Amino acid sequence: MSDIDQWIETLKNGENLKETDVKILCNKAKDILNNEDNVIRVEAPVTICGDIHGQFYDLMELFKVGGDVPETNYLFLGDFVDRGYNSVETFLLLLALKVRYPDQITLIRGNHESRQITQVYGFYDECLRKYSTLNVWKYCTEVFDYLALAAVVNDNIFCVHGGLSPYIKTIDEIRIINRKQEVPHEGVMCDLMWSDPDEIEGWSQSARGAGFVFGADVVKEFNRRNGISLICRAHQLAMEGFKLMFDNSLVTVWSAPNYCYRCGNVASILELDENLKKYYKLFEAAPTDRAQNSKKVIADYFL
């Protein structure tokens, strides 16, 4: 068995990798991610997943429902870490799968794949607690800078963590951003990870303090101009697992059931077949969530 296969087995068992192995894994992942474009072209069939937020045992449920890699192709929309108790295992397993099966799993960046955010919402503290050093946090946050910003499925479905930006009109404009940096406090890269849709016209400031809020007219014009039929995003809790808006021109997919171990929501994944027919698969939290054994304060859920 190769090192990477051994690491995958170790992580699937909920065990931590050695610090030296984390460094090797993160370096391998950076080499692969470095060769990917800002906007990744993905071919259906593919299964799209929203926020995971360190809920490792629920990620295991997700794979039970959706199928294992490489039999199923996956596109994850970011926010792998923070909030949940097992961000280390969650992120490293997804990275290991990416290294082992680079064409079967696509990872894009969420607003929590950020040094600043992880220092507040759990990942930083978890790394320190599990490894008694910040090295693992540093290795992982270096990988964050290499993650793609968006994906397009079959030139028809635009996938992003948060939403749109008033500073761009076309997907091609995303392709020329310098993404290999900490998430900025403003600008296109920030907006892609922080913005939200709402029942408004045009644009407005976001209560999150980053990104914007955008309405149906913005979505329909963006979709028309770019020749796409749907924006698929995550970033906001959907109590029913997913939420369609604006005459089905935008969908939010949420993949962290019983978010923060208290919200009571179901989760979903969106399966697209080769003809882009959509199947929303719902799932609930893992029956025995060992992650809850460690007690800690969880910040409010709206970031």
From Swiss-Prot:
Substrates-to-products reaction catalysed: O-phospho-L-seryl-[protein] + H2O = L-seryl-[protein] + phosphate; O-phospho-L-threonyl-[protein] + H2O = L-threonyl-[protein] + phosphate
One Pfam family cited in the UniProt record for this chain: Metallophos
Matching InterPro entries: Calcineurin-like_PHP_ApaH (IPR004843), Metallo-depent_PP-like (IPR029052), PPA2-like (IPR047129), Ser/Thr-sp_prot-phosphatase (IPR006186)
Domain of life: Eukaryota
Enzyme class per UniProt: hydrolase
Keywords carried by this UniProt record: Hydrolase, Manganese, Metal-binding, Protein phosphatase
Record-annotated membrane-spanning stretches: none
Entry cofactors: Mn(2+)
Co-factor binding details: Binds 2 manganese ions per subunit.
Positions annotated as active site in the UniProt record: 112
Binding positions (Mn(2+) 2): 79, 111, 161, 235
PANTHER family: SERINE/THREONINE-PROTEIN PHOSPHATASE PP2A-RELATED
Protein name: Serine/threonine-protein phosphatase PP-X homolog 1
